[in-house]
């Protein structure tokens, strides 16, 4: 996922007094020479350059290689489920994040200044923000789809186009909400002599409301929707599991049990829900520190110290980590469960109805296309 950069405002002497952040470029935190208690440190682009480049290269390799493996895995499957579709969309978004956000940030670290024309500056910033929104909205779409799969399973089976509609809406909103970036950002020579792709505000007071709106559109509103969706899903699963245990314990008619079992939530769906929740938790862990830091910083609630600058370097890199972690989560959940072939037939003859049902669900679960 894309991360951000931070813009400093200056006093009459050109000394940076404020560090404002904006989630518009992957793992970017820009600050300028700041003086605190007689100590001076320089621009973010020239500070910790080696360490930042090593971190960015590692993130880039893991993001591109990991998501390429995921895309190849989903492409070669004969049976494409709706969950596979969403996994593919998430991998595509993360891959573009690596190419558009992390790679351009690596180039930027090498050059220090922004060397490309103003048009390139605006286009790059626009694409970075599009991916920022898309990464979040794809997760919202996934949560809505899982909600329908568990709470309204019959409508879910009849609505195959819903997944594609959700993704189209997610990307459309991402492109729409990112349009202001084309106007706000441009190539600019800063007071310290650096040439950067920067926000062209009439006044620094515009920065706080802009970042507040972005924070709500990118993080807080989507996170609220996701939390509500999965809260209902977990509650539904818990209720159905309790009902299932009660019915099965009192069930003696095989046909009746079989009929009832068809209305239950399969372990394949349960595993898909677990995968989705872990993906969401990774998103929260990677993005929460950034947005909390960003809000506190924009409302001047953080002290102007060197420690804050060091903290920003670490925190602003966390969102990019999300795109590298997602493929690892997929690999963990897509591991297959094998059964000894020679023992299957003999075991089938002595299995109870419940054991056969559970084993059938495990066989479904072991197939990657059902994840």
Curated annotation (Swiss-Prot):
Family affiliation: Belongs to the G-protein coupled receptor 1 family. Vasopressin/oxytocin receptor subfamily.
Stretches that traverse the bilayer: 53-73, 83-103, 124-144, 165-185, 213-233, 276-296, 313-333
Keyword set includes Transmembrane: yes
Residues exposed to the Cytoplasmic side: 74-82, 145-164, 234-275, 334-371
Disulfide bonds: 121-197
Role: G-protein coupled receptor for neuropeptide S (NPS). Promotes mobilization of intracellular Ca(2+) stores. Inhibits cell growth in response to NPS binding. Involved in pathogenesis of asthma and other IgE-mediated diseases.
InterPro entries xref list: GPCR_Rhodpsn, GPCR_Rhodpsn_7TM, NPS_rcpt, Vasoprsn_rcpt
GO biological process assignments: neuropeptide signaling pathway; positive regulation of release of sequestered calcium ion into cytosol
Membrane-related topology note: Multi-pass membrane protein
Ranges in the topological domain labelled Extracellular: 1-52, 104-123, 186-212, 297-312
Subcellular location: Cell membrane
Cellular component terms (Gene Ontology): plasma membrane
GO MF, one example: vasopressin receptor activity
This protein's name: Neuropeptide S receptor
Glycosylated residues, chain numbering: 4, 13
Keywords: Cell membrane, Disulfide bond, G-protein coupled receptor, Glycoprotein, Membrane, Neuropeptide, Receptor, Transducer, Transmembrane, Transmembrane helix
Predominant cellular place of this UniProt entry's protein: membrane
Organism: Macaca mulatta
């Amino acid at each position: 996922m894309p991360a951000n950069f931070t813009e400093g405002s200056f006093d009459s002497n050109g000394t940076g007094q404020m560090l404002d952040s904006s989630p518009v470029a992957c793992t970017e935190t820009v600050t300028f020479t700041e003086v605190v208690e007689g100590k001076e440190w320089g621009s973010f682009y020239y500070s910790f350059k080696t360490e930042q480049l090593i971190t960015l290269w590692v993130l880039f390799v893991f993001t591109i290689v990991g998501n390429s493996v995921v895309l190849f895995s989903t492409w070669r499957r004969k049976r494409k489920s709706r969950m596979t579709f969403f996994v593919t969309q998430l991998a595509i978004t993360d891959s573009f994040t690596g190419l558009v956000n992390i790679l351009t940030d690596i180039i930027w670290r090498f050059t220090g200044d922004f060397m490309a024309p103003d048009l390139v500056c605006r286009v790059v910033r626009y694409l970075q923000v599009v991916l920022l929104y898309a990464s979040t909205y794809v997760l919202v779409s996934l949560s809505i789809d899982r909600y329908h799969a568990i709470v309204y399973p019959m409508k879910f089976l009849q609505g195959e186009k819903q997944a594609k509609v959700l993704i189209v809406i997610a990307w459309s909103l991402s492109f729409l909400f990112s349009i202001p970036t084309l106007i706000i950002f441009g190539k600019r020579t800063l007071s310290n002599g650096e040439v950067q792709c920067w926000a062209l505000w009439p006044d620094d007071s515009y920065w706080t409301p802009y970042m507040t709106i972005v924070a709500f559109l990118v993080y807080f509103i989507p996170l609220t929707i996701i939390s509500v969706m999965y809260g209902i899903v977990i509650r539904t699963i818990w209720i159905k599991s309790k009902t299932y245990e009660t019915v099965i314990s009192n069930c003696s008619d095989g046909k009746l049990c079989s009929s009832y079992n068809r209305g239950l939530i399969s372990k394949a769906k349960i595993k898909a829900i677990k995968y989705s929740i872990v993906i969401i938790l990774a998103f929260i862990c990677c993005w929460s520190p950034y947005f909390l830091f960003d809000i506190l910083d924009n409302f001047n609630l953080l002290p102007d110290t060197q420690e804050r600058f060091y903290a920003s370097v670490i925190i602003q890199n966390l969102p990019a980590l999300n795109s590298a972690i997602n493929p690892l989560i997929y690999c963990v959940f897509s591991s297959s469960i094998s059964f000894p072939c020679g023992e299957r037939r003999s075991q089938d003859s002595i299995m109870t109805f419940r054991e056969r049902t559970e084993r059938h669900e495990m066989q479904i679960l072991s197939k990657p296309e059902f994840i």
